[in-house]
Swiss-Prot record:
Complex formation: Alpha(8)-beta(8). The alpha component is a flavoprotein, the beta component is a hemoprotein.
Similarity annotation: Belongs to the nitrite and sulfite reductase 4Fe-4S domain family.
Molecular function per GO: 4 iron, 4 sulfur cluster binding; heme binding; metal ion binding; NADP binding; sulfite reductase (ferredoxin) activity; sulfite reductase (NADPH) activity
Chain positions recorded as siroheme binding sites: 478
Entry's EC annotation: 1.8.1.2
Pathways per UniProt: Sulfur metabolism; hydrogen sulfide biosynthesis; hydrogen sulfide from sulfite (NADPH route): step 1/1
Source species of the chain: Shewanella sp. (strain MR-4)
PROSITE patterns: NIR_SIR (PS00365)
Superkingdom classification of source: Bacteria
Protein name stated in the entry: Sulfite reductase [NADPH] hemoprotein beta-component
Pfam families: NIR_SIR, NIR_SIR_ferr
């Protein structure tokens, strides 16, 4: 029996000389604004994707011009924490070296730039490096940006959890010097074929992307169960003692292919803080060795666990870690939203959470968000914390500085907007015009769509109820739509699949309710359901739970078996 053929990316990684490929040669070429097909896969490991302006694609084709290529670069910012000085550097880059002139906060607690011409890539990466920031492993078949609850109320516990998140990020970084050589002009050392170049990853890295999050109960804004690997903090007397480990979550799927599906992670048990790195490395190396390298659509950890079985996977992880799981500890996970406005921490410092619509920090008529953040950064003595809901926390503000910070935020439109419960719990991906995978709008359309949802809630007398609404332009699920009470997933321009039935806490997936429908149909369906919900809901019952209890959709118990159909 012949050996099964590997996915093309596996050969690219093997032949890349530890992610070098011909990126340097492509960067130096002025013949085209793009990289070669192979290098387009490798540059992801360095933190950026090649894109083009899809709004202009046909026009440029008629003019016999190549697409207007640009790049999206994503930074690695573990836990979403950066200093005001770093932010000023980030802002300067956005203002001078990108065509979008904006900073986009992401659903994974970092920021990204859009509209970067190839000639500016190296300058941007070197600019980030001067601020002790980088983009290595922000994309690609590696451990991505590690998330951690900002949780400003429990500041001591947050600090402990954040340190774990940062150590995880640093420990699981690729060891290759390709990034330093290509972008930072460091000297190339003698290339070796020895696997010790990448002691954890090996020559072919992971089969697919790997996402990790640290949650600090009662908050679940990091959507811990949607990650490949999750650590839910367990505290005793305010001190971190360990984590409940979860594994096997992931949102991506492909329309019409039932062998692909979103999945929430399984609970595996409690581990002590000192064993976190052992277990993280064990889970990753099992995925490295067992993951599917022939079909990238089935390469995520969730499929590895489904295909090999929970008990077999658990036993292998314990064997590699050299430690057994203890029974999971009781913790309560609740709200996935952010605490907007001022919140006082246990240390007496104050934290101001700003709502950033779809995470886009940009100066527009009536709202100078980018200027406002710049002015705050010039005087702020604490830090900035990006949230996984695409918002920003001005953290660690002394009582005597509150009025000044708030004044600047209000002056520039960062504070003071009327914010409904649902809008504050809702997110969207970028989608068109830059994302090559988008089938429909998301970020550009989402504010208008939420206006409609707000109006329907007001009409039906349920404005007091927060509903988690999420929209993506495709089923890859960057804004985690399959864990939303109302999920909209792009199918074609102006058309979406409507998903219902996830719970508010993020521990149950939703299920398709209507397929390939337009705005008018979506709003008509939701209007009718909101009317029922207003009358028939039980006390304290959330919308997602209502749709399951009343049989609007069936609960998803085991996604491999019941997400489809």
């Amino acid at each position: 029996m012949s050996e099964q053929k590997l996915a093309l990316n596996e050969y690219l990684k093997t032949d890349s000389d530890y992610l070098r490929g011909t990126i340097k040669e492509g960067l130096d070429s002025s013949v085209t604004g793009s990289f070669s097909d192979g290098d387009q896969q490798l540059i992801k490991f360095h933190g950026f994707y090649q894109q083009d302006d899809r709004d202009l694609r046909n026009e440029r084709k008629e003019q016999k011009l190549e697409p207007l290529y640009s790049f999206m670069l994503r930074a690695r910012v573990p836990g979403g924490v950066c200093t005001p000085k770093q932010w000023l550097g980030v802002d300067e880059i956005a203002s001078t070296l990108t065509s979008s002139n904006s900073i986009r906060l992401t659903t994974r607690q970092t920021f990204q730039y859009h509209g970067i011409p190839k000639r500016n890539l190296k300058t941007i990466i070197q600019g980030l490096d001067r601020e002790a920031l980088d983009s290595i492993a922000a994309c690609g078949d590696v451990n991505r940006n590690v998330m951690c609850n900002p949780n400003p109320v429990e500041s001591k516990l947050h600090a402990q959890a954040y340190e774990v998140a940062k150590k995880l990020s640093d420990h699981l970084l690729p060891h290759t010097r390709a990034y330093a050589e290509i972008w930072l002009d460091e000297e190339k050392l003698l290339t070796t074929e020895d696997e010790t170049v990448e002691p954890v990853y090996g020559k072919t890295y992971l089969p697919r992307k790997f996402k990790m999050a640290v949650a600090v109960p009662p908050d679940n804004d990091v959507d811990v169960y949607t990650n490949d690997l999750g650590f839910i903090a367990v505290a005793e007397n305010g001190e971190l003692v360990g984590f409940n480990l979860t594994a096997g979550g992931g949102m991506g799927s492909t329309h019409g292919e039932v062998e692909t599906f979103p999945r929430l992670a399984d609970d595996f048990g409690f581990i002590k803080t000192e064993d976190v790195m052992k277990f993280a490395e064990a889970v990753m190396t099992v995925q490295r060795d067992w993951g599917n390298r022939t079909n990238r659509k089935r390469s995520r950890l969730k499929y590895t666990i489904v295909d090999h079985g929970y008990e077999k996977f658990k036993a292998e992880v314990e064997a590699r870690a050299g430690v057994k799981f203890e029974p999971k500890r009781d913790v309560v996970i609740g709200d996935r939203g952010d605490r907007y406005g001022w919140v006082e921490g246990v240390d007496g410092k104050w934290h101001l959470t700003l709502f950033i619509e779809s995470g886009r920090i940009k100066d527009v008529p009536g709202k100078s968000l980018q200027t406002g953040m710049r002015e705050i950064a010039k005087i702020h003595k604490g830090d900035f914390r990006m949230t996984s809901n695409q918002n920003m926390i001005i953290a660690g503000v002394a009582p005597e500085d509150k009025a000044t910070i708030e004044g600047l935020a209000r002056k520039h439109g960062l504070l003071g907007q009327v914010l409904t419960q649902t809008r504050g719990h809702s997110i969207a991906c970028v989608a068109l015009p830059t994302c090559p995978l988008a089938m429909a709008e998301a970020e550009r359309y989402f504010p208008e769509f939420i206006d409609h949802i707000d109006a329907l809630q007001a009409k039906n007398g349920i404005s007091d109820q927060a509903i988690v609404v999420r929209m993506t332009g495709c089923p890859n699920g960057c804004a985690r739509p399959f864990a939303a009470e109302i999920g909209l997933v792009g199918k074609a321009p102006g058309r979406y699949n409507l998903y219902l039935g996830a719970n508010f806490e993020g521990t149950r997936l939703n299920k398709m309710y209507r397929e390939n429908i337009q705005e008018a149909e979506i709003l008509a369906e939701l209007d009718a359901l909101f009317a029922r919900y207003a009358i028939e809901r039980n006390a304290g019952e959330t919308f997602g739970n209502f749709t399951v209890r009343t049989g609007v959709v069936k609960a998803v118990i085991d996604a491999a078996k019941d997400f489809h159909g």
